[in-house]
Amino acid sequence: MQPTNPNQFTEKAWEAIVRTTDVAKQAQHQQIESEHLFLALLQEPGLALNILKKAGLEAAQLQQFTERFIARQPKVSGGNQSVYLGRSLDQLLDQADQFRKDFGDEFISVEHLILSFPRDSRFGRLLSQEFKVDEKQLRQIIQQIRGSQKVTDQNPEGKYEALEKYGRDLTEMARRGKLDPVIGRDDEIRRTIQILSRRTKNNPVLIGEPGVGKTAIAEGLAQRIINGDVPQSLKDRRLIALDMGALIAGAKFRGEFEERLKAVLKEVTDSEGIIILFIDEIHTVVGAGAVQGSMDAGNLLKPMLARGELRCIGATTLDEYRQYIEKDAALERRFQQVFVDQPTVEDTISILRGLKERYEVHHGVRISDNALVAAAVLSTRYISDRFLPDKAIDLVDESAARLKMEITSKPEELDEIDRKILQLEMERLSLQKESDLASQERLQRLEKELADLKEEQRSLSSQWQAEKDVITDIQSVKEEIDQVNLLIQQAERDYDLNKAAELKYGKLTELQRKLNEMEGGLATTHTSGKSLLREEVTEVDIAEIISKWTGIPVSKLVESEMQKLLNLDEELHQRVIGQEEAVSAVADAIQRSRAGLSDPKRPIASFIFLGPTGVGKTELAKALAAYLFDTEDAMIRIDMSEYMEKHAVSRLIGAPPGYVGYDEGGQLTEAVRRRPYSVILFDEIEKAHPDVFNVMLQILDDGRVTDSRGRTVDFKNTILILTSNIGSQYILDVAGDDSRYEEMRSRVTEALRANFRPEFLNRVDETIIFHSLRKDQLQQIVRIQLHRLEERLSDRKLSLSMSPEAIDFLVEIGFDPVYGARPLKRVIQRELETAIAKAILRGQFSDGDTIQVAVENERLVFKAIATPTAVPLS
């Protein structure tokens, strides 16, 4: 038979024949023989290698044998490089064609070629003798792989063992102990088993939010099947998870995807109920593989699902179920819904306790029970956009990974010594070049110090290595215990009770004793205070990871921070002058929050700041942001003058569907989603349209708002500050007259009620009235402003000295009770900053000078005083 017609062969078989030419040319052979074809088949992973592997043959050994055989054949060098079909290959192809007819196939496939080799009188005979391969064995393997399928197209290899290619056997993974234990979820698993036991429409679909444990329910069912903890109708069944991505990937031509899916479904139906399919993200089935004029996967599944021929478990989220499956009513009625709710905090703690051992073995650290409780409780409170138990498991996992990283990194004490040694060695090199007596004495002292440090370094290094080795040994023992427990379970399943008892009371007991000894030794090192490494995850680690994720300071208060919090009002007073009531109210709110006593279902605090312009309303918000986040930029500032139209509310929470900017989200909601812990300043609220405040009712009361895309944005860790100038004329009327304070307060409150609705005002924690500023307070503000100017001057190596008269002069011309401190800022800019700038440009001041400012003839005068250069100490 001449292999000139590719239409007689499948794609893979023809590719192998084409490669045969290259193999022969590389070996400098003029005739293509059967050995060249065999080597070409070995070089391409696929069906040929799979058949030979199942026959117990190693690909590497086969390749070596074939290459040695080819190397022994006579070579032809020079002349024409064309190759001809050899007699052995011609006969082999004829034999393959005969096998094709025997099998009832339409094309010569790879399996026909492989099956022909034992009948090859040239290379095949030697191969059979060397590796004990016979035709009968190969035929059985091919029948097993092909099942009842015939070669009816040119790509049949893609349809063989389709489930093995495109699925994962969950029951096999459960048998090998590869699945995590599933704790709880008994009701959902029971309902799934109940639906699977039906005669028709026996297809449960698990519906729930992402991360609540839908896939875990399928894994739990696989574990129950292995343990025999299922009804008779599910005994010895195989649960296979279908990988839709692998099924679609690489399907280049129309109809190729459908062929693959049909092959999978055929294997499932041929198993006569033994195989149960699990399709994670089942919504991907709807529309999968659909191109013009071809069917999608959902339509291929429908007939089998309805008749009960195919038992399938699906899993998808609520949104995707609504979006894809509910639209297809015919597909929806074939599935029975099983709702999977988010577990409670208590259930999550139980789940974490069940998984704890797996994570301890993986990371090689211990996880305290307090850490598990903290992960469940804190993730519920602070991570609102994800679901339990997923977010709590992630916290424990990342905390353990972080601690493992610390164990393998160099301890701080050792790192410090290493740096010091490096520094001293550099100093020693420098001193060795000096010959004077002082340098020689210093060198001797340095040598002694270096020797002591190196000794300490050796001691600490060996201690660190020893501790690291103990922790690694503990991990190895835990892994061994894990393996022994798995063997015990397998022995109990097989009713091999002698083996189970031998392992449980022999090997397992010995390993447990060994583990207890090692952990006891490590605990003694820790309690003695000599330990360099920490190997237990605590609640502090969990809190630190939450802080990293969200920016919310959840970690326990250390002594220095407690002191800082107690002095918070004093710190704020240094920046905001003359507003004791406002500063105290804000400081109290922060102290309540950090002590953990604020209401977890509302924002940390919400204030309305009322007062005339320039008295420190916005400045207090900036000071607070600077204290909490070390930068004023962390404040989310919303200028309400931009929200004067009714429709502008969409800018806060996002444009509704169908409008331009829908995908961008809202200015407020997106900022808070990215930074859940922040100070939000709504400046000049009286300028905004009244309807804008309807959005704020939920924020102030429940600490949450739903944006235009239906996502709940959490405001529970924010401080809301709203500023307004309403009633400022009444505040100015009583400036400095404390006896009329109550009268002024009631008039300001009336003005506020006239402008805002009661349901809005009633939700704000506190309305604070800022007083107009007095002259003596302006003096303090001048000093603050001058301090900032001094910081800017220090960049030019200049310092500033102001006489008391100069400060009084600035206050006098900058004082205006109506406009507050802002005119003062302009006066400093005009009278002081501009004059200094001009003097610098004229060259009046040089580096290191002190600028002395005094008053003469009702104007500021400047004098340069040279600062003496510092004499270095010998």
UniProtKB/Swiss-Prot annotation:
Entry note about domains: The Clp repeat (R) domain probably functions as a substrate-discriminating domain, recruiting aggregated proteins to the ClpB hexamer and/or stabilizing bound proteins. The NBD2 domain is responsible for oligomerization, whereas the NBD1 domain stabilizes the hexamer probably in an ATP-dependent manner. The movement of the coiled-coil domain is essential for ClpB ability to rescue proteins from an aggregated state, probably by pulling apart large aggregated proteins, which are bound between the coiled-coils motifs of adjacent ClpB subunits in the functional hexamer.
Family to which this protein belongs: Belongs to the ClpA/ClpB family.
SMART domains: AAA, ClpB_D2-small
Segments of this protein annotated with the region C-terminal: 773-874
Key word Magnesium present: no
GO cellular component, one term: cytoplasm
NBD2: annotated span: 561-772
NCBIfam families cross-referenced by the UniProt entry: chaperone_ClpB
Region NBD1, residue ranges: 161-342
Binding site for ATP 2: G611, P612, T613, G614, V615, G616, K617, T618
Single GO biological process annotation from the record: cellular response to heat
UniProt keyword list: ATP-binding, Chaperone, Coiled coil, Cytoplasm, Nucleotide-binding, Repeat, Stress response
Annotated disulfide bonds: none
Protein name (Swiss-Prot/TrEMBL): Chaperone protein ClpB 1
Coiled-coil region list: 393-527
GO molecular function: ATP binding; ATP hydrolysis activity
Lineage: Bacteria, Bacillati, Cyanobacteriota, Cyanophyceae, Synechococcales
InterPro entries reported in the protein's UniProt record: AAA+_ATPase, ATPase_AAA_core, Chaperonin_ClpB, Clp_ATPase_C, Clp_N_dom_sf, Clp_R_dom, ClpA/B, ClpA/B_CS1
Location in the cell: Cytoplasm
A Pfam family the protein falls into: AAA_lid_9
Description of how the protein assembles with itself and partners: Homohexamer. The oligomerization is ATP-dependent.
Binding site for ATP 1: G208, E209, P210, G211, V212, G213, K214, T215
Induction (record text): By heat shock.
Chain's role: Part of a stress-induced multi-chaperone system, it is involved in the recovery of the cell from heat-induced damage, in cooperation with DnaK, DnaJ and GrpE. Acts before DnaK, in the processing of protein aggregates. Protein binding stimulates the ATPase activity; ATP hydrolysis unfolds the denatured protein aggregates, which probably helps expose new hydrophobic binding sites on the surface of ClpB-bound aggregates, contributing to the solubilization and refolding of denatured protein aggregates by DnaK. Necessary for thermotolerance.
